[in-house]
Each structure stands twice: as structure tokens, then as C-alpha cells.
Amino acid sequence: MKVEYHTVYLKKRFPLRISRGVFEGSDNLYISLTENGHTGWGEMAPGGTEGAETAAAGQAMLEQFCATGLSASIHDTWQNAHAAGVAPCALAALDMALWDLRAKQAGVPLYALLGLARRAVVSSVTVGINPPDVVRERVPLLLARGARALKIKLGSPEGIEADQAMFAAVFEAAQGSGAVLRVDANGGWSLKDARRMMGWLAEHDVEYIEQPLVRGAEDQLPDLFKDRAMPIFVDESCRMSGDIATFFQSVDGVNLKLMKCGGITEALRIVATARAFGLKTMIGCMGESSVSIAAGASIGALFDYIDLDSHLNLDPDPATGAPFENGITLPADQPGHGGVLSHA
């Protein structure tokens, strides 16, 4: 098997500000696996909490592992790489490339290889933390592009008054569009502020709240859950399937990301575990292009909610394979997951 790596800088069209900081772009790592005329593609968006802060660090881990650790079984490869300490975001790139290759060798779309339907689920499109006047200009642009659900980032360092002012601007700009409104605080609230904001947001028809409390404050979730004004999803608090048992009684759902969990193989386990505990499921993304978004869309039929939109905020997207049509990030209807790095 031929293994190749490419590092590409992904510049965001609009810098994304969340509770933890501002993100303008990233050097993402791409891996291609070629065997018998077929090539599988994978992508890593680096991150400190995902185990590799740079593309170079991720590539070094993968080069060392791929020299001896690849197995005919994708599941065995995942377990071996995880045990060897390969960072989740780097493992995600390898894992999705292996699944892409396997589906191409079988001559079927990845969703079909996994026994899934090509189900169309509306994807959230993110509105980052911004002053109200910026939001009033940006929301119409997202709606014009076809967005039917908006995920509004709150948890502003300026406090919940700033959150309310920004949300009010989104609410005003989206009036009459029919767009569903969802909120992600990225752990930016205290328990007191979360209670207050959830009650206020419920009055404005918000569908759910994501990660209201900071990761590490899961012991406060039971207090928030018992009087919740809307469904609670956790994101940063859920990285692997084994995490779910620690908080399943205090949330309504979990948001997994391929970069957090190490790819499709573990994502399938997270979904199965969440379902066993009676939880809803969501798949999200980080600063990823169409390669990783296409991989996520391939398993989209498993999820109640989808948040696969980061490729829409790239200037340019160096990859293809994740079309956004009528508010839906569609899985590829061709062999593999469909994502390909088109220019490096």
C-alpha cells in the first residue's frame, strides 16, 4: 500500500469566534492510501485537545504507525493505533481513508458499505460570536446559501448580556425564513448563567442547547438537567464511547466529532452506546474541508442532528465531495465517501 501525506492551509472566509477563542484557519493534514488502483482519502484538523497540535505532529505519529501497524481489518488497525497512542485527530484521518479505500474496492458508496441509507438530514450552519451589527449582515448570507438551521455560538467572554444581544440580532435577521435555531455555548456558562440562558432561549424557540457547562463540570449536569427548559447535548464532555456511561442520566444527547473520537470506527461505537442509553445523537465538525465532511456525511443516516458545515466557511475549500443542497450536506452517491483533495 502506498501512503502519501499533504499539508494544506485552510483559510476561513469569516474568522470563527467561540467561547474559547478566535480561529482564522489551520494547517490540515491529508493522507492518501493507494492499493490496486484505488485511493482512499483522509483528513486531520489539528488540535491540542485532539492530541496533535500541528499537522507535522500528526504526520509523525501516522508515519511511525503505518510502517508496521496496518492490518487487513479496519477495526484491528483502529485498536492498534489507539493503543499505540496515535492522536485521535490523526487516527481519524487514517480511519476515514481506510473506510474510503474499502468502499472503493467494493465499488459502493461508503454509506451503502455500512448498511445505511442515503438519508437527507438538514445540517446546522454555524453563526460565530460577533457583534449584533455583524450578525445582522451575516445571517442573510447564510440563509441565501440555503441554510435551514442555524447553530448560534454563545458563551461570550463579555457575559450573558452580550449573548442575549447577539442572539436577538440572529433572531431578528432570521425572522420569516423558517430556519430552525440551535445554540452551542461551548462550555462558556456557569451553572447559574446556564439556567438563566436556557429559560430565556426557550422563550425564543431554540431547539436545544449544546455544551452549556465547561468540560470537567459534568457533576453539575444533574442540577441543570432536572429543571431544563430545553434538551441538553454534550460535545466537549463526550470524546469516546466509554465516556457516555458517566453522564447519560443527565443529558438528552451527545455530539460526536470524527476528530475527537478517532474516526468512523469509534463513531459507530458512540452511536450504538448512545442509543443503548436512550440518548439522541448528533455529528459535528471542527475546521475540516470536504474530505472529512464527506466522511461524516456518509454516516449521517445514523444521527438525529447534523452539524457538518465547516467546509462552507473556507476560502477556498481545497477538496470536493460534500455538496450542500437545500440545507443538507449530502453523502456521496459514488464509491467511497466522495471526498478528494483536489489541489494542494
UniProtKB/Swiss-Prot annotation:
Mg(2+) binds at residues 184, 210, 235. Binds 1 Mg(2+) ion per subunit. One of its GO terms (biological process) is amino acid catabolic process. Its cofactor is Mg(2+). PROSITE patterns: MR_MLE_1, MR_MLE_2. Keywords: Isomerase, Magnesium, Metal-binding. It comes from the Bacteria. One of its GO terms (molecular function) is magnesium ion binding. This is Hydrophobic dipeptide epimerase. The lineage of its organism: Bacteria, Pseudomonadati, Pseudomonadota, Alphaproteobacteria, Rhodobacterales.
